[in-house]
Structure formats: structure tokens, C-alpha cells
């Protein structure tokens, strides 16, 4: 894929990808609702921008309701690490009335908890669909990331099958095995594989990571991406660029 413009990295932890794009000579900026690492270029309510931009695609296109998408062209690329807090396999366990974390809750509170979580999950699902719709309907290029473990909610009849599933991210230098899906919208991935295995002493378990502090904000520790993985993913699947490290194969 040729990127003549800029890369726009959305949501938490996207700064790692931003930095690696810049190292590869491609201009990049990141956007998020918070700035916990002091490096976010644009602190914005991404959900609001997605909602408003989707409305523009199906209503009057002459509306002056400006969003961040107005400055993104077809020569650019959006890389979105969409919040997985309601889609991950760990999240699906929270939908059970008998989940161990609810053992001290009265039954009426358990029902309210599950119903509230179900409503939030539907809201986030619609936002993800709208983000993909905005890009497909306007021809803007997008790569969306989300977990793809056994019980992941998005396996249950999502609107598109993933373009790529990376079943073991440690093979490309990440901290977690963490099976992950990537959807390429208005573009196609390249198919390289740079083998750079992570030292086993540095591999982490998702279940041991700290949870999120509030709804809509993913766990920082679970969402962490190593710079090595970001660079290898960019070169293997976005740029089709052979590197001088590791071993590159094609499948």
C-alpha cells in the first residue's frame, strides 16, 4: 500500500504505531479522548466525530458540521484501535449472572448490571459499524484492530470477516500472544511475515493485566503494543516492506 498522505491513528495505544510510522518516514498523528502518556496530538471525542460523520454520509452532504474526517483524504490511512471493552472474551464472562465477580450481588442487581452492559455493548457495536461505514462509503482507507480470542463477541455474525487474523503476536515481537483481528476497509493488506520472536521472559498474560477504570476506556496494560510489533505489522501488512531484521516469508 502506498501512503502519499498522512496516517491518522485513533484511540488509546495508537501512539506506538504513530511513532513507528514516523520512523519509517511517513507523517502520522494520533487522536484520543485522553492523554495519559502526554503524547497525544489531538484530544477529541472520537465517538462524537464518528456519529456526526456517519450522519453526514446519509443526509445532506453540504452540512457544515465539521469533523476530523473532513481533513482526511483518500491518500491518507486511518489505523483505529477500537475499544474492545465490550467485545473481548473477558467481557463476555461479565454477561453471566453467575460470574464469580457477582457472587456477592443480590439477584436484582445482577440483572441490572447485565442489562446495562448489554446496552453499552450495543452502543459500541454501532459505533464500530459506523466508523467502518464512514470509510467505506467515502472511500477513505481504514485498518481496524480488535481482539479475536475464542469467545470474542465480534465472531458472532459481525458485518465483515477480518482481513487478517494474527493468532500469536509474540512471533512479531509483541508482549502478548493475544489473537487479534484486523479489518482493512477501502484497501487491501500485503502478506509478509517478519519473524522476530519475543523473549519468553517478557511475554505477558492478558488475564494478569489490570482492568479498565471506566466504561469506554480499555485497560492500558492489556492494550499495550510493543514498538517491534507495530513496526513489523506496518511493514508486513501495510507497506509490504522487507526489513533487514528477522526472517521475512510470504504466505
Model-inferred region functions:
Residues 1-251:
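Conserved active-site and SAM-binding loop architecture
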